[in-house]
Amino acid sequence: SAINNGYKDVHVDIKISDGSPVNVKNVIEGEASIAMISGSTAFEAWNSQIGTESSYDGKKLCALGACYPECSQWIAFRESGLHYVNELKGKSISAGVDASVTEAASRAVFETLKIDEINTELFGLGLRESADALREGKIDSAHSFYTAPFEAFEVLAGEREIVLLEYREEELESILRRNPSWCRIVIPAGQYPGQEKDIVTFGQKVLLCTSTEMDEETAYGIAKALDQMAAEYTGGHRFMASMQDKD
């Protein structure tokens, strides 16, 4: 990893977790030294918005760096004739599993575009289930709030011509006002087979976080390693290329 190779005073062991909310709790309570946490979850933790039973102090959460973005991606087959997200009203679409980050993003989109279960057929499918449903013709479009390219969507794009649906500028501005942790993100042309132009969407940064209990020297060493080893860390991972963006 970038940290192990760039900062010899520490060694990082990787463990699979149950998601950002659990990672927040583990970091603050000392069960984990560092963890990957989505920007929106970190924001909610800092503002004590994660659950009414949380006993930890969200102000103890500290970000060491932004590692990669995850963003809103609506995919459809080119033959559908769809071009914009606002054309999904009246269609059959997958909005993500209940309480997932994809579902939360879908909800903000639907509120902006006046889409609901009355005027549109909505399915709460997981990301890979959504891709399968689109392939089988059960839905017209699938939504992913994840890294780009998302593997299951990339496989679809290799099988049939796809389009990434676009947001209009005023729609993006309205969506971004709903969540201060979201930002404008560009999916570069060529991320998916057949994607001919950049797609402007919204998303969030995934942060490497620790607690304020970590000593300053160690925190600085880890952050410095992330910066200096960015080129090595992003090698072969297109969605992590933004780590090298100094802006």
Q: Locations of the language-model features?
A:
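Bilobed "Venus flytrap"/periplasmic-binding protein-like clamshell domains
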Residues: 1-6, 10-13, 66, 70-136, ...
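A structural signal for short loop-to-beta-strand junctions that line the ligand-binding cleft
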Residues: 54-67, 191-200
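N-terminal (or domain-start) structured segment
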Residues: 1-44, 53
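Extracytoplasmic
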Residues: 7-9, 19-22, 29-32, 58-59, ...
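Sec-exported extracytoplasmic/periplasmic mature domains
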Residues: 4-8, 28-32, 47, 79, ...
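N-terminal hydrophobic or amphipathic helices and topogenic motifs
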Residues: 1-13, 28, 59, 231-247
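Pocket-lining segment of extracytoplasmic ligand-binding domains
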Residues: 39, 49-50, 80, 116-215
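Segments of small-molecule ligand-sensing domains
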Residues: 197-247
